[in-house]
Amino acid sequence: MSRVVVVGAGLGGLAAAARLAAGGHEVTVLEQAPDVGGKLAVERWRGYSFDTGPSLLTMPDVLSELFEATGGPPAGLRLERLETACRYTFGDGTVLDLPGRREEIPAALDAALGPGRGAQWADLLARAERMWHVVREPFLESPITAATLPAMVSSGVGLAEVAPWLSLRAYGARSLRDPRLVMLLDRYATYTGSDPRRAPSPLVTVPFAEQEYGSWYVPGGLGEIARAVRERAETLGARVHTGVRVARIEQADGRVRGVVTSDGERMRADVVVANADAASVYGMLDGEAPLRTRLATAAARFRVGLATPSLGGFVLLLALEGLPEELRGVHHRVLFAEDYDGEFDAIFPSLGARAVGTLGRAGGRLAGPPGGARGPSARVGVAAIGRPRPVRRWAGGQQRPGRQRQPAGAVRLRGGPQPGARCPGARFRGGRRPAAQRSAWPLPL
């Protein structure tokens, strides 16, 4: 039996804790936020509830396998498959209700966008499926190391299917000739805050997985998943502590020996599992290690520093009443801008945060079935996406008090029924910046 410290109680950390505890190890989980789940969080306000992170579950079998491996299905966690995954409204007024089952999608595309569109999308998904079978095991089900990467590309077939030299947009162009289908594919690049014209082709496996395995929701919010996994880990003997920040991961004799919290408490460990941002983890590693290890850590830290940060969208969490019946049954609604490329052009060359598009025309999302006793809650994601900016002080994080100290901004609503109307951020409970932006005070440009 080993003593294990898990740093971070996001879903990955909680799942690792549950599996390790089921294997008989002594497990302690340390989370700096007041609650577990990381981005998988639910905001509750006056009878309303909002998913503040992911709002869909794909590949539910992965979750089922976790619970089966650690004791069986949990009580009180119910998954619902969405019959309509998303309602898309394009700039030309076309409305597409995308089914939640892959076999129904071609007919829906033909009906909404015109004959032949379903065949174009089906061809794309068939290619994406072949890529999925190449990348799933090495990238999703195995540790990625220098030894495992060559195995994936050892055959010309695997390399050709992945086509890493193509962008997501270029990969899709081989199948898609309707610009609205191109928009549909491009949207999946925004899942990672990326430009589809630069994002790597393997992102095409995201729509494949979503449409092959279905779009699922958890009544009460996806945060219920984090609650259930925490309960499973604790039932198996793991100890979960929130509000505890790890300041340092100690090393000695060429291996980790434990962690030190920001309060100075030292916790010994045979193994440390880090469910945290890579840059943070490399920053936690202390210098008490052999020269070779320190050099490798420094090199890894340097490589992480060169990575391009992803982007996030400005999100409003709105408690809505009196919604039309046709909107109540739609879990997600995306409103595409008339010039979708214009959004990406405005975002990526800029060095500063800037608004892109408007509420009436920009990409947005209305998410959430009835979430509270007083009516449905909704999350509207506005295409107001900003590039990272220099900061003068880091404070707070995903669920820390720092987010409350952000100066209230204003969103101008153009093209709506009230021209010139302003929505000060301080007046909307739940109005959010992306997590990375909420954790810093920006420097003036």
Walk through the language-model features, giving the residues of each.
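Helical element adjacent to the flavin cofactor pocket in flavoenzyme catalytic cores
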Residues: 205-256, 260
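Rossmann-like flavin
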Residues: 91-199
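Mid-domain catalytic core of redox enzymes
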Residues: 247-365, 444
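A short glycine/serine-rich beta->alpha loop
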Residues: 45-49, 192-193, 214, 302-305, ...
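N-terminal glycine-rich phosphate/pyrophosphate-binding loop and immediately adjacent elements
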Residues: 2-134
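Glycine-rich phosphate/pyrophosphate-binding beta-alpha loops
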Residues: 54-60, 189-190, 194, 313-315, ...
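C-terminal lid/capping helical subdomain adjacent to the catalytic/cofactor pocket in oxidative enzymes
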Residues: 163-164, 175-179, 197-203, 214, ...
